[in-house]
Curated annotation (Swiss-Prot):
Claim: Chloroplast is one of the keywords in the record: no
UniProt-recorded name of the protein: Flagellum-specific ATP synthase
Taxonomic path: Bacteria, Pseudomonadati, Campylobacterota, Epsilonproteobacteria, Campylobacterales
Similarity section: Belongs to the ATPase alpha/beta chains family.
Major place of residence: cytoplasm
Localization annotation: Cytoplasm
Gene Ontology annotations for the cellular component aspect, listed alphabetically: cytoplasm; type III protein secretion system complex
EC assignment: 7.1.2.2
Gene (name only): fliI
Residues bound to ATP: A164, G165, S166, G167, V168, G169, K170, S171
GO biological process, one term: protein secretion by the type III secretion system
Reaction catalysis annotation: ATP + H2O + 4 H(+)(in) = ADP + phosphate + 5 H(+)(out)
Amino acid sequence: MPLKSLKNRLNQHFDLSPRYGSVKKIMPNIVYADGFNPSVGDVVKIEKSDGSECVGMVVVAEKEQFGFTPFNFIEGARAGDKVLFLKEGLNFPVGRNLLGRVLNPLGQVIDNKGALDYERLAPVITTPIAPLKRGLIDEIFSVGVKSIDGLLTCGKGQKLGIFAGSGVGKSTLMGMITRGCLAPIKVIALIGERGREIPEFIEKNLKGDLSSCVLVVATSDDSPLMRKYGAFCAMSVAEYFKNQGLDVLFIMDSVTRFAMAQREIGLALGEPPTSKGYPPSALSLLPQLMERAGKEENKGSITAFFSVLVEGDDLSDPIADQTRSILDGHIVLSRELTDYGIYPPINILNSASRVAKDIISESQNLCARKFRRLYALLKENEMLIRIGSYQMGNDKELDEAIKKKALMEQFLAQDENALQPFETSFQQLEEILR
């Protein structure tokens, strides 16, 4: 058989195309190379002339060349360095032995607890749950926080956002939710956080107990690709446990820094900046991640809380606006409430849970609605009450709100260590409204 015919037949069954090439051009967040033809999402590696290596993911595939974004920094790389194909798509280790461990988005443990014994490698990018395979959210997901359980009740498989400016208490609230919920598995993605905040979150907010937790960490000094895929890696871990029939709590801090990472990548690729400099891909990436959470028929559930950092407490920020439109509820933290010493500073009037009315009883629903109505009356007339312009007896409902003001504020405030069962929260709510 002629050599050319043999090669053609072999090509039908095996990929004989070259798996190495060379660097052609290096830019701040993207490297261009040629020599082989990878697909978008494939993982490649640069072998630098100084002997070090740099791993990256293909984000541009053209006929004559391809571009990839590095997972780590590319100092020392130069045109002509060898580029090798590593694997098709990014995978991440999963298994029960991940519990209690802290990993980076490359699947490397960073907790000094020895090598990781994992079950298998799972793809990082997967298809969200099909709409008709999603289970109805009909069970309560208690988080141990009075104002959430009583007034913004969450359900198993619900997706919620925690919206707040910097320094208002997002991390503290997320720690309370993690410790207060009854989910057997908790997966936490810390994306774009300062390095010192990682041990602080573990020791202060989680009280050092990681027995039921898996942490995936990409700090602010990591590359944009690490920060982007850290969130997807954590979601893949949550999906593994969900597919085992378990209820999983997924916590991510923060969506804003995740979107900022994609903004850096998108702008490097030449995407046009739109609102506040975010390219279209930064906004379209959000549902790809968030829709993977939820409840699936004949499997478990992923109940997700995504924190969103809003600049200057501006809820019209494009990332905050897009996130709110995707999720099933939003919890807004108010800087004003911190001035009154109310922690966690949840603004119940600006917050909402879209499934609450479907999972609590009619009497519980009436209690929650009445509390919000009385609290809204207090806020609307706060100035009149403070300056003494309101006379008791003019409005029966406002009179009731004024009498119950101290009790309502006491209900909204909660020490971070004083977590309590769902039933206790509603008993206290009923006692206030009697």
